[in-house]
C-alpha cells in the first residue's frame, strides 16, 4: 500500500480504493520561515471533487472513479475515498500510441462542454491571486459556461496499456463551469498535474477573463473559492 504526504495532503493506495485527505490541524507542516502552512480552500477542493465525480458519473459516459465516501473526519481532516482506477497514466504510454488515447480524451472533453450553466462554479484555478480579494460570482444571461476539468494533464488520464482504452479521468478538484478557454489541453504535453495553476501566463484568455471580474456584478464572495459545483447543481435542480 503506497502512501505519501505533501504540505497539504495525505494520499494512500489500498487494494481496491484510494484515499485523498487533507492534513488534520495536528499534522500541519511549517514552511522555511517556521510558519504553519494552512490551505484555506483545501477541504473545499476535495468536496468539489466529490460532487463533480458524482455528477459526471450520473450525467455522462466519461469514466471516472466512483466515490465511496467523502466527508470531514473527527480529527478535522477531510477525507475523499474513491474506487481505484486500474491502468497507467497517459504519460507512460509510448508517444507512438498516444494519439489513440488523445482521440478519446477529445471526445470526452466535447461531452463535458455540452454541460452548460449560466453561473461560474468551482474553486478558482488562479491560486496565485490574492486570497483577500473580493471575488465575483459571475453570471451570464445565456448558458455560456461549460464544464471544465481544469487540470487535464497526462498524469490525470489513466489508460489500459494493452487496449489503450481510457479507464478513468481523475483529480477533478478544480472542475466547474467556466469559459471554454479554461480547459487547456495539457494532455498533449508532458506538463505535470497542476500545470494550469502554475502556468496562467500560458493561457492569455484567462487573464482577460479575470480582468473583467473587477466590474461590479451580481454577487461578491470573499476568499479563494467561488461557488462549489454542488451549489450550482442544487440550483439547477431547483429551477
Where are these regions (language model features)?
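Soluble or luminal CAZymes and related metallo-dependent hydrolases
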Residues: 44-48, 97-104, 140, 149, ...
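Phosphate/pyrophosphate-binding loops and the adjoining catalytic core of nucleotide-dependent enzymes
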Residues: 1-33, 112, 116-120, 146, ...
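Well-ordered beta-strand positions
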Residues: 11-12, 158-160
